[in-house]
From Swiss-Prot:
GO terms for molecular function: 3-deoxy-manno-octulosonate cytidylyltransferase activity. GO terms for cellular component: cytosol. It comes from the Bacteria. The lineage of its organism: Bacteria, Pseudomonadati, Pseudomonadota, Gammaproteobacteria, Pasteurellales. This is 3-deoxy-manno-octulosonate cytidylyltransferase. Its EC number is 2.7.7.38. GO terms for biological process: CMP-keto-3-deoxy-D-manno-octulosonic acid biosynthetic process; lipopolysaccharide biosynthetic process.
Length: 253
């Protein structure tokens, strides 16, 4: 099975400007992400960016780069521009790896591509079991609810499903014993589906939750969710996250 990884790397960030270029123990964050994608066995890894400085840095460490607009509202829109510019065939499997995930395990990059390939859907993703109350009620931790076939029913920043009769006892033990899932922000799609996705109008749900995958559910598409073979650390959204990642990576050297 062949697949292409595209890494959206947007320069602007309200909390961490220039995030893809932030130094982690001597290397830019985007280089760690690119290396993980290479280790996953992708036949092609493309960094999609809107900023010439990211392009220069990425090319310096050997990455293939596609310059994109700075007007995109989501990573998927950036992917669509890459697919069009590079004339990627509609049946090609595209894996979207976020540019702020320097600790993403290569095994799950490969897993999400396989998930798409074997389940006959246009979009696939991964999740891990939630184990703490803190995660459940953290709006930065996206939750997903699935059916018995692993198809996503919904994604939310809220604590879903809501334990109506057990709220007062909703401690870590209770959370770990239930069907709560933390969504991992990695996706696989067919290139042709990415074109369809961006042709749809944005929806009220994706705008309320600020979750682009809800657009696919709104328009009736199925998203297959598989339990990840390895739980990744959270990505880098804040200065505190960056400090944590620096510490974790310094311990692996």
């Amino acid at each position: 099975m062949k697949f292409t990884v595209i890494i959206p790397a947007r320069y602007a960030s309200s909390r961490l400007p220039g995030k893809p270029l932030l130094d982690i123990n001597g290397y830019p964050m985007i280089q760690y992400v690119w290396q993980k994608a290479q280790q996953a066995g992708a036949n092609r890894v493309i960094i999609a960016t809107d900023h010439p400085q990211i392009q220069t840095v990425a090319k310096a460490f050997g990455a293939e780069v596609c310059m994109t607009s700075d007007q995109h509202q989501s990573g998927t829109e950036r992917l669509a521009e890459v697919v069009a510019k590079m004339a990627i065939a509609d049946q090609e499997i595209i894996v979207n790896v976020q540019g702020d995930e320097p600790l993403i395990p290569p095994i799950i990059v490969q897993q999400v591509a396989t998930n798409l390939d074997k389940n006959g859907v246009n979009m696939a993703t991964l999740a891990v079991k939630l184990t703490t109350r803190e995660e459940l009620f953290n709006p930065n931790v996206v939750k997903t609810v699935i059916n018995d076939k692993g198809m996503a029913l919904y994604f939310s920043r809220a604590a879903v499903p809501f334990a109506r009769d057990h709220f007062s006892e909703c401690d870590d033990t209770f959370v770990a014993s239930q069907c709560y899932l933390r969504h991992i922000g990695i996706y696989a799609y067919r290139a042709g589906f990415i074109k369809q996705y961006v042709a749809w109008q944005p929806t009220v749900l994706e705008q309320l939750e600020s979750l682009e995958q809800l657009r696919a559910l709104w328009y009736g598409e199925q998203i297959h969710v598989e339990l990840a073979k390895q739980a990744p650390a959270l990505g880098v959204d804040t200065a505190q996250d960056l400090a944590r990642v620096r510490q974790m990576l310094s311990q692996t050297v």
